[in-house]
């Protein structure tokens, strides 16, 4: 009996590595030392930072993965994986430096895995982050046929003096919300239930002319390059930032707000995108549940000094990023620190 007889095909794993090598190398930065295949990936941090603080993050894509597998859409789920990780470390002002992925399946399908890793490599390249390594695990009997799981890991760096930790946030600071590309990678257990119960055809078209399934599978927006540019040009104006992930607008912005302060968010400041309006209508989802589950069209938030907000908005306009003033920092309302009206 061989390892292949037991369900593990080493040749398929080697074929995958050869397939993805050119994709991965396109994401490399000058600081990457060596190539793929070593026991550890190497990255030279010297020369760029005086007092670097490393910022790490790890995440998955939740049950959006289930929908991707159901639809056979494997080429963009890797972008989601990158976005969930790099947008998180960006919150503290860090530049994502490198990324590693974990791909696990019961039986390795080289074409599927290559499509997934290709998306990861593309997301890394778009974020200026090197896909420096990863693990492909073929584990017979652990996953049903055709299914796989993903996890991502990233490390970024920021000068100690430029670290954003929320300590600078003050009463009266302005919240500037940057548009999301859709639900990103959160709320998909509820999304899948609504989608199944609604019985909507895959070709169903939303009010803006977008196919429903395209809106649901739109890759997570990558905020790294535009936000790093803002930090470089207007860094003193930005007191904190938030990535709107699980917990929605209700639970994410408040994570970077000091005790004693709260948030007033004006829901009329922007229009709920059609995909979220469809989900709320078809799922009979209450407003409070929408705010707590989905990003509702706001994927990233800048918390800025009010005197500098207009300059930040002009800089966002210059980058063609849709944005809105969605609220402000206020004294906390007792136990209710976040109000959305």
UniProtKB/Swiss-Prot annotation:
SUPFAM superfamilies: PurM C-terminal domain-like, PurM N-terminal domain-like. The keyword DNA-binding does not apply. One of its GO terms (cellular component) is cytosol. It is found in: Cytoplasm. Pathway: Purine metabolism; IMP biosynthesis via de novo pathway; 5-amino-1-(5-phospho-D-ribosyl)imidazole from N(2)-formyl-N(1)-(5-phospho-D-ribosyl)glycinamide: step 2/2. Keywords: ATP-binding, Cytoplasm, Ligase, Nucleotide-binding, Purine biosynthesis. InterPro entries: PurM-like_C_dom, PurM-like_C_sf, PurM-like_N, PurM-like_N_sf, PurM_cligase. GO terms for biological process: 'de novo' IMP biosynthetic process; adenine biosynthetic process. Belongs to the AIR synthase family. This is Phosphoribosylformylglycinamidine cyclo-ligase. The gene is purM.
């Amino acid at each position: 009996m061989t390892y292949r007889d037991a369900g593990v095909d080493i040749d398929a794993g080697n074929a995958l590595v050869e397939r993805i090598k050119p994709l991965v190398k396109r994401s490399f930065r000058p600081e990457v030392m060596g190539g793929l295949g070593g026991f550890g990936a190497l990255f030279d941090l010297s020369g760029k930072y005086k007092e670097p603080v490393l910022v790490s993050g790890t995440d998955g894509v939740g049950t959006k993965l289930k929908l991707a597998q159901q639809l056979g859409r494997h080429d963009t789920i890797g972008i989601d994986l990158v976005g969930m990780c790099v947008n998180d470390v960006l919150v503290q002002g860090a530049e994502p430096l490198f990324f590693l992925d974990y791909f696990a399946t019961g039986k390795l399908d080289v074409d599927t895995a290559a499509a997934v890793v290709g998306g990861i490599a593309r997301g890394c390249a778009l974020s200026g982050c090197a896909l420096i390594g990863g693990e492909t695990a073929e584990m017979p009997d652990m996953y049903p046929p055709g299914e796989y799981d993903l996890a991502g890991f990233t490390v970024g760096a920021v000068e100690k003096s430029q670290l954003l930790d929320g300590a600078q946030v003050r009463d009266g600071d302005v919240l500037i919300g940057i548009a999301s590309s859709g639900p990103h990678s959160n709320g998909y257990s509820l999304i899948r239930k609504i989608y199944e119960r609604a019985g909507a055809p895959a070709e169903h078209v939303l009010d803006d002319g977008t196919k429903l399934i395209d809106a649901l599978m739109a890759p997570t927006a990558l905020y790294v390059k535009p936000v790093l540019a803002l930090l470089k040009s207007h860094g003193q104006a930005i007191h904190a930032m938030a990535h709107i992930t699980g917990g929605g607008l209700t639970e994410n912005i408040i994570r970077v707000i000091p005790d004693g302060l709260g948030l007033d968010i004006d829901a009329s400041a922007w229009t709920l995108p059609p995909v979220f309006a469809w989900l709320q209508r078809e799922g009979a989802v209450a407003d409070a549940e929408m705010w707590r589950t989905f990003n509702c069209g706001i994927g990233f938030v800048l918390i800025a000094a009010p005197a500098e907000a207009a300059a930040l908005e002009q800089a966002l306009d210059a980058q063609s990023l849709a944005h809105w003033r969605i609220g402000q920092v206020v004294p906390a309302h007792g136990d209710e620190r976040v109000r959305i009206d």
